[in-house]
C-alpha cells in the first residue's frame, strides 16, 4: 500500500499448487506496483492458502463472488481511483469475467491464461504421473477419473479433494473477449487461449517468454513479467493521488488466527499465529522448505497447525525472508538466514506462551535442516517433528544426488513413452532447460554449507528430547536419509522414532497419505 495511491490492482491467484508457484511473482509485482503508486491487494480463496475452510467444501460459484468482494473492498479503500485486475492461469479467466461483469475495472492483465477444461486435464495428468512414481503405474485412467467426476464424485488429485461440482464449473470456465484494455501474456505456453481474449480488439499480446513458474520447483527469474506488468499499468490514465482510507482496512485477526510481522521493519518476517482453542498446553513452530511458504505443500502446514490449535497448541507459521509474504527477494534466501529467522520466531513464540510451556518444532524438507540446527542451539525444545528430512553434512552420502537424478530420469523416461510428449517436443512446448536443471542440478551444496551442517550435527549430539522422522516410501532420498539419521541418533543416544508412509512422495500429495502423516504426528506431539 503506497502512502499516496493513484490506482488499485486486485491480484487473483490460481488454484491448487499453482497458487504456491505464483505467490512469489505476485509479491514481487505487488511491491513494484506500490512503488509506482498503485495499491495492490492479494487474497486467498476460501479453502485455499491461509483462508478459512477446506478445499473440499468450497462452492465453486463463490469464487467469483469472492473476487467481486475483494474488488469492492479495494474500491472502498481507494474511492474514485481506477481499478485494475491481474489474474494468473485459471485466475486470469476469473479476472476477465470480473472485468466483463463490472463497469469499474479500468484494465486487466492476464498471465498465461488457461481454460478451466485444460486446467482440469493438467490436474488429472499430474495426478497420473505422481501415481506412476508412487505405484509403478497409474491405478486409474484419465477417462475413469473424469467419469467419476462427471458423476458428482470427489477425486483426490494430489492432496486436493476435487468435487464433481468444481470439475463441472471448470468445464464452463472459458476465455471471453474483453471490452476493457488488456495485456495478455502467454509466455510461450498456451498462445491459443491467450489469443481468444483478443476478439474485442482491446487486448495486447506482448512477445515475452518465461518458464512455467506456477509449476516449477524452486525459484525462477520472472522479473521481466513483473516489470512489463507494472510498466503497462503505470502508463494507463490514473486518478489524482490520494491517501488510502485505512480505517476500512481488513482486520489483522479473526477468532482463530492473527496476521503479524516482526524483525527488521525494512525486511519484516510475515507470520500467522494459529490461536489455541481453550487453555494453552504448548506451542508449535512450523518451518517450511526451501521453495515453499508458511502454508506448506497442499496447505499441510495450515491444516496441521489448525488441528494442533484445536488441541490447545499456540502455533506460529512464519514465512522466511525472501519467501511468501516476508520481506526480501528470492535471491536473499539461504539456510543460514532461514535459521536466523527461525530463532527470531522461536523467541517470539516463547514470549507469548505461559512460562515453562513446552515447544515443538515442525519442519519439512529443507526446513528440517533449520529445525535441527535450531534444536541444537536451543536444547530446551521439547519435541522435534521432521517431515521428509534431507541428510545433512557428512550424513549425506554421494549417492543421494544420484538417487534423485535416477528417479527424475525414470520419471522423464515414462513421459517419453507417451505420444503427447513427442508432440509437445515438436511444437517447442517442453521447457528443455527446466528438464536439464532437474536432471543435472540435484541438491548441490557449497563447501561452506556442508561445514555449517556438520557443525550443527556436532552440537545436536547433546539433544536429549524426542525426535520423530517421517518419510514417504517413494521419496528417492528416504532410504539414505532414514538410515543415516537412525545411525546418528543411536550413536549419540538421541531418543527418536521413525515412520514410513508407504508409497508417499516427498510432499505427501494425497489425502490418504496426509491423513496418515497427521495421525502419526499427533500421536508423537500429544
Region locations from a protein language model:
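Short, surface-exposed "cap/lid" segments of acyl-processing enzymes
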Residues: 2-44, 277-320
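Alpha/beta-hydrolase active-site loop signature
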Residues: 16, 45-50, 115, 291, ...
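Catalytic nucleophile-loop/oxyanion-hole region of alpha/beta-hydrolase
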Residues: 49-80, 323-355
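Short beta-strand immediately N-terminal to the catalytic nucleophile in serine-hydrolase-like folds
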Residues: 84-87, 111, 361-363, 387
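Gly/Ala-rich beta-loop-alpha elbow adjacent to hydrolase catalytic centers
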Residues: 86-95, 362-371
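The alpha/beta-hydrolase serine catalytic core
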Residues: 104-230, 380-518, 524
